[in-house]
């Protein structure tokens, strides 16, 4: 936003009305800026990129615009600041290849350096994780910087860099959900902060649904095998052929046909240990008046 100023006064120009029109528009959009819709899913589909955090709703953007213009015009006698803290990034890998993601919390005044060493590196092989960053200073609302040739108010953002081999083009390597806190204050703030915190997210194993149904599994195997023009003769190789048998108690089991032949040739005798039938014993002692009496003479 271009702004003509001198020591005594400042005026509102055409660029100011253009910025206000964009803020009031429901289709508010700035190239390289993370809007509310983008905070749902930030896709790292480039090798390197940066996106700046904006207020979450149009009212906050409008209030910030009014505060900045009031300061520029000399209406306010005090400065105002935006305090951004507790930047939470939920990172989920989107490829099944090793990829390294480097993140920095940056200021639009200098997007090359991390703010207070707030930088971290995660790997896709580690699975999803949560990265928590913080900011140790507030940003004056009057400050302006240039983004893509346009003058906008100074803001914080997330810079990412992806290092991954064997991929080309615009491939999404990670998806990032960004959340943060933003507060308005008339006083500047400065806090000491700790290093970024990385919290891994434990996930369960995905089991094939078709493996739970033996009938569906058999049908899938049948559809996946070409059995036409095949003879039913036994295999002539030294390896014994295998077949798929379904057992209600044990489920799907791969059995060797030689085991069945061996059981037919050498049947296992039925012993008391493997006999499942139980003998019902009947007592012959009569019961008289609730007491048992012996029948022996």
From Swiss-Prot:
Gene Ontology annotations of biological process type: transport of virus in host, cell to cell
Region (Disordered) location: 249-297
GO cellular component terms given for this protein: host cell plasmodesma
Signal peptide: none
Name of the protein in its database record: Putative movement protein
Pfam families, A to Z: 3A
Domain of life: Viruses
Gene name, Swiss-Prot/TrEMBL: MP
Function noted in UniProt: Transports viral genome to neighboring plant cells directly through plasmosdesmata, without any budding. The movement protein allows efficient cell to cell propagation, by bypassing the host cell wall barrier.
Ranges of compositional bias, category Polar residues: 270-297
Keywords associated with the record: Host cell junction, Transport, Viral movement protein
Species for this entry: Citrus leprosis virus C (isolate Citrus sinesis/Brazil/Cordeiropolis/2003) (CiLV-C)
Main location, first listed in the record: host cell
InterPro entries: MPV
Subcellular location: Host cell junction, Host plasmodesma
């Amino acid at each position: 936003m271009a702004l003509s100023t001198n020591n005594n006064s400042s005026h509102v120009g055409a660029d100011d009305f253009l910025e206000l029109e964009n803020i009031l528009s429901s289709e508010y959009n700035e190239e390289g800026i993370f809007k509310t819709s983008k905070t749902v899913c930030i896709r790292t589909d480039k090798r390197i990129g940066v996106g700046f955090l904006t207020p979450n709703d149009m009212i906050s953007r409008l209030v910030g615009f009014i505060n900045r213009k009031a300061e520029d015009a000399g209406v306010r006698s005090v400065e105002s600041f935006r305090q951004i803290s507790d930047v939470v990034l939920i990172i989920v890998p989107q490829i099944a290849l090793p990829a390294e993601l480097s993140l920095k919390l940056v200021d639009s005044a200098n997007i090359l350096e991390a703010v207070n060493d707030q930088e971290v590196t995660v790997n896709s092989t580690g699975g999803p994780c949560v990265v928590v960053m913080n900011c140790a200073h507030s940003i004056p609302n009057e400050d302006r910087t240039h983004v893509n040739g346009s003058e906008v108010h100074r803001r914080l953002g997330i810079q990412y860099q992806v290092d991954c081999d064997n991929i080309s083009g615009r491939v999404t390597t990670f998806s990032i959900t960004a959340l943060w806190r933003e507060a308005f204050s008339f006083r500047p703030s400065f806090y000491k902060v700790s290093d970024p915190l990385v919290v891994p997210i434990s996930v369960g194993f995905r089991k094939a649904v078709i493996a739970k149904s033996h009938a569906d599994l058999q049908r899938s195997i049948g559809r996946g095998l070409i059995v036409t023009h095949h003879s039913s003769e036994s295999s002539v190789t030294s390896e014994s052929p295998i077949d798929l048998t379904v057992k209600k108690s044990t489920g799907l089991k791969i059995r060797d046909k030689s085991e069945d032949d061996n059981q037919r040739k050498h049947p296992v005798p039925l012993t008391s240990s493997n006999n499942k039938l139980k003998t019902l014993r009947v007592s012959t002692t009569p019961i008289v008046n609730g007491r048992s009496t012996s029948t022996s003479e």
